[in-house]
Design a protein with these regions (language model features):
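Flexible, glycine/proline-enriched loop segments at strand-loop-helix junctions
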Residues: 3-4, 78-80, 132-139
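N-terminal start-of-chain detector that recognizes signal peptides
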Residues: 1-2, 21-24, 71-74, 85-87, ...
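N-terminal active-site beta-alpha-beta segment that forms phosphate/nucleotide-binding
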Residues: 9-90, 95-99
Length: 212
């Protein structure tokens, strides 16, 4: 049975991809997570080093599992046993071949909207890895950056805070309080409107609800 939401998203994606290309980024459309996995396989040569930021979409699409089972070097910070080891892995991320992440929101103009706590994710988006692949579900499309920032604080952060047990208003009240708590997830806001190194950032639009 046809899904009108997916049909509408497919149409909207054409506009977004055109705007991404104008901004020096590559844009792709996939109907399903399975299609996205096949696309990633075609974009990422075997033997590449793989890093990723905090992203549920990377796991939900099955892309992470696929890469772990393939011939890739996975730079997994979760395997670090000390703060020193974790920092070393974070630094390796900057020199990785491919960095995977999602976006908190993506505007119709092709602008990536991200708010980060630890901020390794937005740091690698901005500089370092040879390629950045951004996996974006259709639930993250917004009209403009203002709507994108609102989406982060009202839709994305509360469940993410609950997942991470931050102890911030996002978790305890269910809405962003623009706090200065130790577990604050809203430390750095990055809006990516242009990519100077053409093709470095590749955005894959997936016609599914993914991530937060």
């Amino acid at each position: 049975m046809a899904d009108p939401r997916k049909d509408a998203f497919a149409t909207t994606s054409k506009t977004i991809i055109k705007n991404l290309e104008r901004a020096g980024m590559e844009g792709y459309f996939c109907e399903t997570s399975a299609d996205a996995r096949e696309l990633v396989k075609s974009l990422v040569p075997e033997g590449s080093s793989i890093a990723w930021g905090g992203t549920e979409t990377f796991k939900e699409t099955g892309v992470k599992e696929m890469l772990e089972a393939g011939g890739y070097t996975m730079l997994d910070r979760a395997k670090a046993t000390t703060p020193e080891e974790q920092r070393a892995v974070y630094l390796q991320h900057f020199d990785s071949d491919f960095f995977f992440m999602s976006a908190n929101a993506l505007t119709l103009k092709g602008e990536l909207v991200n708010i980060d706590g630890n901020s390794n994710r937005v740091a690698c988006l901005s500089f370092g890895p040879k390629h950045v692949i951004v996996l974006v579900g259709m639930n993250k499309i917004v009209k403009d950056t203002e709507e994108g920032l609102k989406r982060v604080r009202t839709i994305a952060c509360p469940p993410n805070a609950a997942r991470l047990h931050t102890g911030t208003p996002c978790e305890t009240v269910g809405i962003c309080g623009m706090c200065h708590e130790p577990g604050c997830m809203c430390c750095n806001t990055v809006i990516t409107r242009h990519n100077r190194h053409a093709g470095r950032i590749k955005v894959i639009l997936i016609a599914e609800d993914l991530g937060f």
